[in-house]
Amino acid sequence: MEIGIFSQPDTVDKAVEHAKLFSDAGFGSYWMPQIFGLDTLTALTVVAREVPKVRLGTAVVPTYPRHPAMLAAQARTLQQVADGRFTLGIGLSHQMVIEGMFGMTFEKPVRHLREYLSILMPLLNGEAADFDGETLHGHLGLEIPDSTPVDTLVAALGTQMLNVTARMAQGTATWMTGPTTIGSHIAPTINKAAAEAGRPAPRIVCALPVCVTDDEAAARATAAEQFLVYGFLPSYRAMLDREGVEGPADVALVGDAATVRAGIEKIFESGATEFVAVPYDNRDATLEMLAGLL
């Protein structure tokens, strides 16, 4: 099983500490988000220098606030330090963030993704970008030696987003998406689109909250509180509705070790290629159990 760990440290030193801990435990990858704290690409550049083996990823960096050329420069700089271990996860974020907090327009998100990738992907592959879109333009190359191409995952959940991702990036990174939805929607949609475009089979990286515990009811109550907001964001709400569940706590993998193990196995059986655990409670027991699966 390809299992990684996600955390959201508030200092660069803690990011290094977490990455070392997870790497020493045998986990294959370490993932951080870009929300309202550290600049994740900067933090992971330090992590890449200090922790030499574990693969690194962002889950995810919002696209709208950064021109694709600037994001490409950051990602390839990180990749130069990481020596090929870095995966760039990007996402559109949400209307309430992009419009309400940044004052930018969130209209036509599928167009935005297509135009963004049209500039970003050549630059990440060491090529020049030469593109004019309706809202984004890019005519430049980057001079960053000793930086291998950067695999790019998109937080694509809807059908149109999955189709664009399959044709232009290396895969999708999901959140709040259970095994039923991965098996019936995410995997078949992105795999079909990639095959039709003559692209390699895409990566499907599934992230979910995880807690190994003897008190499932209490752990689910904690999950319901900690992850409440995701049930109100339209893109995640659509996936929860597809799954046939009420809220985020219902897709969390919670229970004793055998129950959580079975839940992870179901994720892979549904078509995911990688699983990223988000331990949120009873972390020591959860990490110990997850390490036992490696």
Model-derived features with residue positions:
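Active-site-adjacent structural elements that line small-molecule/cofactor binding pockets in enzymes
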Residues: 1-294
